[in-house]
Amino acid sequence: MNILVINCGSSSLKFQLIDTDTEKVLANGICDRIGIEGSVLQYKNKEGKKSEKKEAMPNHTKAIEMVLEALTNKQNGAISSLDDIRAIGHRVVHGGEFFKESVLINDTVIAHIKECSDLAPLHNPANLMGIDVCKQKMPNTPMVAVFDTAFHQSMPPQAYTYGVPYEWYEKHKVRRYGFHGTSHKYVSQRTTEFLGLDYHNSKIIVCHLGNGSSISAIKNGKCVDTSMGLTPLEGLIMGTRCGDLDPAILEYISKREDLDIQSILNVLNKKSGVLGISGVSSDFRDLLDADLGGNERAKLARLAFAYRVMKYVGAYCAAMNGVDAVSFCAGVGENAKFIRGMIVKHLEFLGVELDEEANNICGQEAIISTANSKVKVCVIPTNEELVIARDTRAIVSQLKD
C-alpha cells in the first residue's frame, strides 16, 4: 500500500511516498520557499537520483501540483498514476484535547484542527492548507491526520496541569500538551526493539534534540511527562527558543525595553535560545567552531543547553522511579557527539559510562554507553514519516471499499 506523507509548513512542504508493505521510501523531497521568491522543488527517487526544479510557487496549491507531477513523471517518477497512491497521511502539529490518536480526516476533524489554531498559529493553518489542497486534487483518496500532540495525551493530570486558576483550563484549555510526539513514539518503540526490551514494561527517556528540542518520559509504552507545554516554547533551551523562564520577565522587559507582549514573544521564539545566548548562531556546528575559537558566549550557550537537558533527564528518572534507557534523536541528538558527551558524562549517578569510541558514530543506531553501564544510552535516528505512514495504513485498512 503506497502512502503519501505530507508535512506542510508555512513556507515549505516536505513529502515522502512510502510503500508500507516493505516500508521502503519510493520518493521524497521538499518544496521550499513557497510564496517567496526563489521557490524550488527538490526531489529524490528510490534509486537516490536527485533532481531540482525552480519554479514560482505562489501557494501550497502550486506546490502540491508540482509534487504530484514529479511523482508521476515518466523519466524520474515513482508511480505511473495518482491512482497508485492509496492514502495520504498529514502531519498536524496541534490536536488539543480533541485527539488522542490519529484519525481519518472529515469535516469535523478539520473543524477541530481549526479550533486548535490559536494554540499553534504558525503550524496548524499551514497543515490545514495541505489538507485542503490534497482534498481538491485527490478528492477520492482517504486522508489521515497524525498529531504531534496525540502521543502525550496519556500524561496524568498532575503532569499536564499548570499552577494557575483552574478556570483557565476549564474555559481556555490552558495545560501542557507537548510536541514532537510522533518522534517520541517512534524512538521509544525502536529503542526497546534495539535493546531487546519489552516496550510495555520499560522506562525510556527520549531526548529529541534539534533546532526545536523536547524530552519525554515514556513508562510502559505511555508518555507520562514531556518538556514542551501549551506551546513549543516551554522546556529546553533550543536553537532560537528560550525554554523555561520566569513569567515575570515579560513585564520586567516590557517596561525596560518598551516592548509589547507580542514583540517579546517574537524575541523568545525567534531570537533567544542558543542564538540569543551566543550571539553567533542557532546551529550547533557554528557554536562548536566558535567555542573552539575561544568565544566564551558560544561556550556558555552549549553548556546551558546541555545543563537543561541533564536537569530534565534527572527529573524524569524521578517521575518514573527509574529508567532503563536514554535515547538521543533529531539533528543535534543524532549528530552532535560533543553535546551528547557533555550530557552523558553527567549521568554517572545512574551508573552510566560513556563509550567514547561509540559516541563518534553519527546518524545511525548505536549504543554509546559502555557494556558495564546500568542504564543504556542510545542514538536512534527518528523516522516520523514512517509512523505517519503506519498510522495511515492502519486506519485506511479498516475502511470498506
UniProtKB/Swiss-Prot annotation:
It is found in: Cytoplasm. Its EC number is 2.7.2.1. InterPro entries: Ac/propionate_kinase, Aliphatic_acid_kin_short-chain, Aliphatic_acid_kinase_CS, ATPase_NBD. The record marks 180, 241 as: Transition state stabilizer. It catalyses: acetate + ATP = acetyl phosphate + ADP. It comes from the Bacteria. Mg(2+) binds at residues 7, 384. Homodimer. Belongs to the acetokinase family. This is Acetate kinase. It comes from Helicobacter hepaticus (strain ATCC 51449 / 3B1). The gene is ackA.
